[in-house]
Amino acid sequence: MNQPIMNRKIKLLAICLFITTTFMHAQTFLSSNHAMKRVKTADKYILLPVEEEEGYAHIRVIKDNQVVKEFNCKLAINKTDYNVPLDVSEYGGEVLLDIQFSGDKRSIGLINNFVCWKDIKATNVFDSKNREKFRSIYHHTPVYGWMNDPNGMFYKDGVWHLYYQYNPYGSQWENMTWAHSTSTDLIHWKNHGEVIQPDALGTIFSGSSVVDKENTAGFGKDAVVAFYTSAGAAQTQSIAYSTDNGETFKKYVNNPILTSDVPDFRDPNVFWNEEVKQWNLILAAGQQMNIYSSKNLKDWKYESSFGEGYGNHGGVWECPDLLKMGDKWVLICNINPGGPFGGSATQYFVGSFDGHKFTCESKPEVTKWMDYGKDHYATVSFSNAPDGRIVVLPWMSNWQYANQVPTQQFRSANGLPRDLGLYSYNGEDYVSVKPSPEVFAAFEKKPSGRLQSAAYIEVTNIKSNASIVLSNDKGERVTMVFDIIFKFLVCVVLLF
């Protein structure tokens, strides 16, 4: 054997050895629906193959005989629709995956033939480049995975913070976690990933955040304090706090802070009530809203309930908000189902609030809807918004079909931000809703410049009508308009 050939073989052997030590995995089949898979890898992520038509597999991530994470994922059995990343970088290069498939899988073939075993891979980079035709441009969407209710929104130091209900292990509802995005203009959003993850108390359901300017909770001046529902065997309320402007959170050691025997007991919304110098909390409790008060954000006193006999009760009440508008108060109540055109929707009540009790000014049978479209739900406001504004953001979907919309890389979007106001008509007070000024500013940005000679412009990926205007110092103008529906160009010439 000559030397060059030998060198090539040694290099090839070295490459093979490197691959083997970088990602080694072997599975042990324990029954028709139970397996364990030991994974050794120096990479950051394990890619889990997902098949959306299958049932959920319960996965426990075990390190040094301790469960460090558990979640549900529709692992691929017949085919892989897409992959989701499991970050294992903090576990020292080796974990044991304990996988329990739902149901008895003997009817669809032997467990060792499931495609997930060959499609599980390791990588240092998860490709999140958009692959979806129907991803919105002006509406916030998750990079990948499932999203529903907006949560914990606040404004601080020129930045809008949006948290949201998130499933990092599939594009359908499951594994509720808080993920985080930020924006300086309410239109262009930067994704920051997961910030509050499930724990022994349960998954992380909806809630709110406040900026504790006076350090009433003792977590630090200007700490961001998040309130959320721990959805375990029972629904209880918990706290997490941040001292780095909402980038990371630490959970309060004495969670939960509120408990109840009501099954649907969730979605705490907290605000500072300047009129009575106290914190108030409103949350959904069955078919009503409970109101609490506190001086320190930790210890809460029950004050009253609202809802019995008022408005629409065609579904579960959830995701409340209580807002001061002028000399009135508005209580927002999201309901599912029961919307005017089916499914989920947002109703509201106008009245007075003294820090202890909300009193509706309308007759009990009156129902006021914030929006009559089907894709408007879980509407809540940004805390600490500037200039006294009330800025809200809805979830742009409906529980009738949210899990089945025609995307897979991600599912769901938020509606455009909107500012709320109050007006009167025929003796009744109503909430006015209009797109936030930031929305109009985004559409008003039109590139322009002076042409020195001829120019060639190539426009690609057009998703709406577009126009180009050419003009000169004489006031002559040529307007070219592309019609996205009929796919043709119209040219209008104005000469003097």
PLM regions: where:
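Beta-propeller domains
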Residues: 56-58, 62-65, 134, 138-142, ...
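Surface loop/turn signatures of beta-propeller and other carbohydrate-active proteins
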Residues: 29-33, 67-86, 108-151, 170-173, ...
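Hydrophobic core segments of beta-strands in well-ordered, beta-rich domains
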Residues: 48, 97-99, 149-169, 191-195, ...
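Beta-rich accessory regions
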Residues: 28-65, 88-90, 95-106, 126, ...
